[in-house]
Amino acid sequence: MRRFLLASVCVLISLTFTAAPGHATYVREIVLDNGLKVLLLEDHKSPAVTFQVWYRVGSRNEKDGKSGLSHFLEHMLFKGTPKTKPEEYSRIIAKNGGRSNAFTTTDVTVYFATMSRDKIGIQLELEAERMTQAFLGETYFEPEKKVIQEERRLRTEDNPVSALAEVANAVAYTVHPYRRPVIGWMEDIQNLTRQDLLDYYRTYYSPNNAFIVVTGDFSTEEIVPTIRAAYGKIPRGPVPPKLRVQEPAQKGERRVILKKDAELPFLFMFYHAPNLNDPDNFALDVLTVALAGGRSSRLYHDLVYQKRLTRGVDADYSSVSIDPSGLSISAQLMPGKEPAEVEREIDGLLDKVKTDLITERELEKAKNQIEASFIFAQDSIFGQAMKIGYYEATGGWQRMNDYLDGIRTVSREDIRRVARQYLDRDRRTVGTLIPTKEKVP
């Protein structure tokens, strides 16, 4: 193990993970005395650097009645600091040839920019300042609240499919905070106060509750002292409260019907499934791709090509989450087709996967798709940073080591076993969108 001699403020360790046979990538890990972890991956293919700050806080950390706090705070961090004016952060990055943005999920809040090697220090300093010195003034609080409420209207309330997924998700989880939308419920957003934001900011925005990911054309020996100078002086914050909520086992199918102005009916099925802490996650990934990973997949071939019941069909499963997640199947129906008919067809196809082994060709095709996607996602420095960040946030970036090896070990018997175990109708929630031109109260 290679070690670098640095000041006592940090420890630097060089570690590796293998993204593909014969392709080694070197991630170097720093931990400052204040608890801030920094993950560095040099890649000199193009003259750019991606710098990301990940906070270990998302909608799962919010309380009932306070949904949307994480996302609201993300917006407010662009309203200035002692050294920058409102919205000036983005202008400074753009003026120096960079691109910047931020996003919030159930598990994390992330701020990022991609700039040239000689300019990345600008963003590094800006992010260090707003870690603890963001202006959360009353002047911008109420106007930004209206912006977020309008965002919710456009993305969810005026989008029938998003609205269905949101309400189905709220029914699928009865206890766990994953039941709440990341953007928040409209009434909760309306009732949030500036003091709520201040308390949340002081609780979760600190070096010991964050980590940095840097990828691209930089020198570790040069950037480490810069990071140390900017972030090492920020004091460690209080230890954020630990969230330990376990969703009770679902013991019966749940259903929700949403009547909304829409073009066509839509069907959404959600099955509870484990995250990356369970070794079954590899087989579930392969199962998901075999079911609906492309036009030759089982569901797509049957529902779209042969039976012409749906315009499309999709299956989604992500093991990269802090808590157990789910496997979902969704489909937009063809005109004149009934949701019950499509549901029966899907159930029949799922039953076949539970009773009969998928073919060797299906297995290898799904594995190849997953491997290609995993490697392609790291083709850009931004994609590399995102992959490292998500794994670090949910279980440790080192788990990237195991992913492709885990996929390669999946057998046809594994696929049948996890299909039987997790595609259980007593463990699912079915959401149906019924189009209507009438205003539903």
Model-derived features: where do they sit?
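Positively charged n-region of N-terminal signal peptides that target proteins for export
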Residues: 1-4
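Bacterial N-terminal signal peptides
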Residues: 7-16
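His/Glu-based metal-binding/catalytic segments typifying zinc-dependent metallopeptidases
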Residues: 153, 170, 239-298
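Peptidyl-prolyl cis-trans isomerase
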Residues: 42-45, 263
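Charge-rich, well-structured scaffold segments of protease-associated domains
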Residues: 26, 31, 90-239, 257, ...
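M16/MPP (pitrilysin/insulinase) zinc-metallopeptidase core fold and M16-derived inactive scaffolds
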Residues: 27, 45, 50-114, 180-183, ...
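Boundary at the C-terminal end of the N-terminal hydrophobic targeting segment
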Residues: 19-24
